[in-house]
Amino acid sequence: MKKEVYSIKMRKNMLFRRKKEGKTDYKTRLALLKSKKPRLVIRKSLNNVILQIVEYEKSGDKVLISVHSSSLKKLGWSSHRGNTSSAYLTGLMCGYKAQSRNIKEAVLDIGLAPSIKGSVLYAAL
């Protein structure tokens, strides 16, 4: 049988597939992981906001706390869940959960979203 040999170019494409797809910025991720603190991951869609406190592990990131803005509906919030007010309340819920689990600080991770003053991302912070 003939042994398959992968070229360097092919290997590089395999290693950085998520970068090529526009899903991961490895330079920013490395800077966040160097802090050795948990990350507050904020992801926004048109209708919802998701907040997670994530800790790095070699086997994969471990989610310590997860809060979704759809949980506001259970608490009586009848308004839209993708706006600034909902993001603020979701962030408040995440803060209370973090206090109950004795998490004092975290590093903000907004991913590939642009950092804009007054945005939903900072309302959740």
Residue ranges of predicted features:
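Intrinsically disordered, Lys/Arg-rich N-terminal extensions and targeting peptides
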Residues: 1-58, 66, 70-74
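Compact nucleic-acid interaction/catalytic patches
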Residues: 62
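Acidic helix/loop or adjacent segment enriched in Glu/Asp that either coordinates divalent metal
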Residues: 75-100
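Generic non-transmembrane alpha-helix signal with a bias for helix starts/N-cap capping motifs
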Residues: 91, 120-121
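Beta-rich strand-turn-strand
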Residues: 98-105, 116
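Acidic, metal-coordinating catalytic cores used for nucleic-acid/nucleotide bond scission
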Residues: 111-120
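Extended, alpha-helix-rich binding/interface surfaces that flank or overlap catalytic cores
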Residues: 124
